[in-house]
C-alpha cells in the first residue's frame, strides 16, 4: 500500500492483518520504520478483552515514540470481530514523527478494513489510552453537545428560578445530561446481565469521584425486588424479568430508577436524573442491550408482580363506541292524529 507519505506495508504485515481480522490476534502494535509499516508486537487472546486491555496495551506505549495499536474486542459485526484503533502520539515525541503518524493514520485504517474498526482513540498520555480512559471516551461520545455561552447563561437562570421544593413525580428543571464514566466492575456486570449470567444489577453514583459504580448483583426473583430498593438513597436497577405472556416464555430487561424523594439531597436527585439518559444510551447503543421497559418509582412497595407485568405488557384499551341513537318505529311514524285544530273544526261545521 502506498500513501501520500510514501509509507508502504510489507506482504508480511498484510498477511498479519488478514489473520488478525479472522480472530487470531488480540493486539497488533504498528510502527513506521524506514518508510514502511511494521508489526513490532502482537498478542493472542486468552481471556476477555477487558481483562487483557491494560496489561497488553500500556506496557507498549513509549514516552517519546508514536505508534498505532489495533486491539480486538470480543464483539462481532457483519464483517467479523470489532476492533479499537488507537493512535498514540505522546507530547514529547518529535514533531516530524507526530506529523508522519498523523498523515498515515487514515490509510492504515483503510488498509486494515474500516468496517472492522468500532472505535478510534487518540491519546497523548497513558490515562487517555487506559481502560478507564476508554470508558470515559465512550461516555463522552454519548453525552450531549457542549452549550454555548448564551445557552449556559440561560440554563443557570432557569436553575435559579426552579423551586427547591421538588418531589419525585414533580416536573422540574434539571441539569443537562451528564455522562459519568462507568467503572470496570459495573460494566462487566452489565455484560454478564446481557448474556443472562446475572439476573440483577444495581448501580449507584459515587458523587465524590463522579463515577457510576456497581452496588449489588444478588440473584433476585420478582418477589425479592422490593427488598433491593433502598429507602434512603437513589439507585439504578437492571432486572432480567422472566415471565410468560400469551403462552410464550419471555426474558425481558427492565430498567428501574428508584428515587426516595426528600430523603435524598437536591444535588443527589439532580445528578441521578441527569446521568440516567446518558447511562441508558450507553447501555442500549454500546452493549446492545434492548430494554423492554423503563420504570421510575419512589419506593419498593410498588414493585408487585402484577405491577411489573402490566408495565411490561400494558393493557390495550378497547375502542370506545359512540352512543347509537335508537331507531324510530318501523313503518308509519305513530298513530294518525284524530283531534282537529280550531280552524279545521269550523270548516267541518260549515
Curated annotation (Swiss-Prot):
Cross-referenced PROSITE patterns = ADF_H (PS51263)
Q: Name one GO biological process term.
A: positive regulation of neuron projection development
Keywords noted in UniProt:
Actin-binding, Cytoplasm, Cytoskeleton, Repeat
Q: What is its main location?
A: cytoplasm
Q: Tell me the segments the record calls region Disordered.
A: 316-350
Subcellular localization(s) per the UniProt record: Cytoplasm, Cytoskeleton
Q: Name one GO cellular component term.
A: myofibril
Every ADF-H domain range: 4-139, 177-313
Please give the Gene Ontology molecular function terms for this protein. Answer: actin filament binding; actin monomer binding
Subunit text: Interacts with G-actin; ADP-actin form.
- Report the protein's function: Actin-binding protein involved in motile and morphological processes. Inhibits actin polymerization, likely by sequestering G-actin.
Q: Please state which protein family the record places this protein in.
A: Belongs to the actin-binding proteins ADF family. Twinfilin subfamily.
Kindly provide the name given to this protein in its UniProt entry: Twinfilin-1
Traced from the root, the source organism's taxonomic lineage reads: Eukaryota, Metazoa, Chordata, Craniata, Vertebrata
* The gene coding this protein: twf1
Amino acid at each position: 500500500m502506498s500513501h501520500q507519505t510514501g509509507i508502504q506495508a510489507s506482504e508480511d504485515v498484510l498477511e498479519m492483518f488478514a489473520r488478525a481480522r479472522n480472530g487470531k490476534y488480540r493486539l497488533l502494535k504498528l510502527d513506521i520504520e524506514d518508510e514502511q509499516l511494521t508489526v513490532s508486537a502482537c498478542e493472542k487472546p486468552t481471556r476477555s478483552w477487558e481483562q487483557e486491555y491494560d496489561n497488553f496495551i500500556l506496557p507498549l506505549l513509549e514516552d517519546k515514540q508514536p505508534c498505532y495499536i489495533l486491539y480486538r474486542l470480543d464483539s462481532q459485526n457483519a464483517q467479523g470481530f470489532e476492533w479499537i484503533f488507537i493512535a498514540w502520539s505522546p507530547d514529547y515525541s518529535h514533531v516530524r514523527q507526530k506529523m508522519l503518524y498523523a498523515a498515515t493514520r487514515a490509510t492504515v485504517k483503510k488498509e486494515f478494513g474500516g468496517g472492522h474498526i468500532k472505535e478510534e482513540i487518540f491519546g497523548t498520555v497513558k490515562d487517555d489510552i487506559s481502560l478507564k480512559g476508554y470508558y470515559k471516551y465512550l461516555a463522552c461520545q454519548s453525552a450531549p453537545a457542549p452549550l454555548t455561552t448564551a445557552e449556559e447563561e440561560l440554563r443557570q437562570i432557569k436553575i435559579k428560578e426552579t423551586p427547591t421544593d421538588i418531589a419525585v413525580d414533580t416536573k422540574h428543571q434539571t441539569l443537562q445530561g451528564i455522562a459519568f464514566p462507568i467503572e470496570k466492575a459495573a460494566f462487566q456486570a452489565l455484560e454478564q446481565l446481557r448474556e443472562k449470567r446475572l439476573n440483577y444489577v444495581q448501580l449507584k453514583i459515587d458523587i465524590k469521584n463522579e463515577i457510576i459504580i456497581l452496588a449489588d448483583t444478588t440473584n433476585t426473583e420478582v418477589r425479592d425486588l422490593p427488598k433491593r430498593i433502598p429507602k434512603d438513597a437513589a439507585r439504578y436497577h437492571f432486572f432480567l424479568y422472566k415471565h410468560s405472556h400469551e403462552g410464550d416464555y419471555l426474558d425481558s430487561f427492565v430498567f428501574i430508577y428508584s428515587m426516595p424523594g426528600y430523603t435524598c439531597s437536591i444535588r443527589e436527585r439532580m445528578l441521578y436524573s441527569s446521568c440516567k439518559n446518558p447511562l441508558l444510551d450507553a447501555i442500549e447503543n454500546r452493549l446492545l442491550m434492548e430494554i423492554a421497559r423503563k420504570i421510575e418509582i419512589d419506593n419498593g412497595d410498588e414493585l408487585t408482580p402484577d405491577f411489573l407485568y402490566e408495565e411490561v405488557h400494558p393493557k390495550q384499551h378497547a375502542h370506545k363506541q359512540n352512543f347509537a341513537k335508537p331507531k324510530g318505529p318501523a313503518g308509519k311514524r305513530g298513530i294518525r292524529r284524530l283531534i282537529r285544530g280550531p280552524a279545521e273544526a269550523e270548516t267541518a261545521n260549515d
